[in-house]
Regions:
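Carbohydrate-associated surface elements
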Residues: 49, 160, 182
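Nucleotide-activated donor-binding/catalytic signature segment of Leloir-type glycosyltransferases, i.e.
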Residues: 246-265
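Aromatic "clamp/platform" in nucleotide-sugar-dependent glycosyltransferases that forms part
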Residues: 286
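Nucleotide-sugar donor phosphate/pyrophosphate-binding loop at the beta->alpha transition
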Residues: 118-120, 128-150, 185
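A charged, aromatic-enriched C-terminal amphipathic alpha-helix characteristic of glycosyltransferases
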Residues: 342-366
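Short hydrophobic beta-strand element within catalytic cores of glycosyltransferases
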Residues: 303-306
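Conserved donor-binding/catalytic core segment of Leloir-type glycosyltransferases
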Residues: 194-221, 234
Length: 366
């Protein structure tokens, strides 16, 4: 990624959300954008301001960030017509659309096609808490298919995505490039085993949305406490479902055993320290590909319990995690958690991709 080779390449990355908001897509875009920029590629991140008040333009870690207003404010299904103008009036060599789940993606692809700018799309497959939107995924894919078929490249972060989207969109698998998420946490000292012995910490990591399944971990905790009375749960994330999670913990009489809060987006050292202090990471989302949290848990050698469907199940099939049905009863989830605490899965050595690998693969695709 030398500057001489890539000085002329101007990449516009379009994403519905970006820092200071926290989430898997936001983290992915930040990690690859900063690495591409440090190698000489001119990277601009175009995103939306869903609440108002964020700078319209700023520079973060050598990457120019541009924000356009979202309407209506505060809604996940917002429109952002300003995306069209930025694409139409810029001098971009390629437009990279990150995530296809909002109205931002078709706007960006349509605008790029109108200007005859090559565009690629990374799906970042995931679920949604809104039942109507979840049921409308099939219609969404049908409507987006012509735009996706015209893309210069389609990027999946997991084999699961290639199989699913190829089938649903009737696009040959050869059109997809597999570029997994990276994992790169700083090395931190292991937690004090003597101090924490008998006080197991269960971590559930991800944006606070219903489909992420944090409520399943909270519901299982009373049953875990029957066998491990000092167990605690850390729900690591932020989002609109926080109040409901707190109310559930209070209703079950375990509020003092449940911590809910995110680590600051840029503080990877603190994230590593909190994860290392955990005894098991539990990800019971309705739908995921390969979430960064899962890869980070694997990289730290932590026991990992995942939902058996979607890309999480793929991790279990590879021997990197144990799995359970996302709809299992609270008692069954508790049994699975206790099993991980008592007899954690022993993994074979595995080489995980880094963010440098991810950025280099994207540059090759461009």
């Amino acid at each position: 990624m030398s500057r001489a080779e890539n000085a002329a390449l101007r990449v516009l990355m379009v994403t519905p959300r970006y820092l200071p908001q926290i989430g898997g897509v936001e983290r992915h875009v930040h990690e690859v954008a900063t690495r591409l920029a440090s190698g000489g590629t001119e990277v601009t991140v175009l995103t939306t301001d869903r609440e108002g008040g964020l700078p319209a333009r700023e520079r973060l870690d050598s990457v120019e960030v541009r924000r356009v207003p979202a309407h209506p404010r505060g809604r996940d299904w917002h429109f952002a017509p300003g995306v069209v103008g930025v694409i139409a009036h810029g001098r971009w060599d390629i437009v990279h659309v990150q995530s296809y789940h909002t109205f931002v993606a078709p706007l960006a692809m349509t605008a790029a096609a109108a200007r005859r700018i090559p565009y690629v799309l990374t799906f970042h497959g995931g679920g949604h808490s809104d039942a109507l939107r979840h049921r409308g995924r099939g219609l969404q894919r049908t409507l987006l298919r012509p735009l996706l078929a015209r893309a210069a490249g389609l990027v999946a972060v997991a084999e699961f995505e290639i199989e699913e989207y190829s089938r649903e969109l009737r696009i040959p698998q050869e059109r997809f490039a597999l570029i997994p998420n990276g994992v790169e946490l700083p090395r931190v000292p292991a937690a004090n085993g003597d101090e924490d012995a008998g006080h197991p910490l269960i971590a559930s990591v991800g944006r606070l949305e219903r489909y992420k399944g944090h409520q399943r971990v909270i519901a299982a905790l009373p049953h875990v406490l029957a066998s491990a009375p000092s167990a605690r749960v850390w729900i690591a994330g932020s989002g609109p479902y926080e109040q409901q999670l707190r109310e559930l913990a209070a209703e079950l009489g375990i509020a003092e055993r449940v911590e809910i809060g995110a680590v600051a987006a840029g503080d990877r050292g603190e994230m590593a320290r909190r994860l290392v202090a955990s005894d098991v990471v539990v990800l019971l989302s309705d739908f995921e590909t390969h979430p960064i949290a899962a890869l980070e848990a694997i990289s730290l050698g932590l026991p990992l319990l995942v939902a058996s469907g979607s890309g999480l199940g793929e991790l279990a099939q590879r021997g990197l995690a144990r799995s359970i049905d996302a709809d299992a009863t609270a008692e069954r989830v508790a049994e699975a958690i206790l099993h991980e605490l008592r007899d954690p899965l022993v993994r074979s050595p595995v080489v995980l991709p880094t963010w440098d690998d991810c950025a280099a693969a994207l540059l090759d695709l461009y």
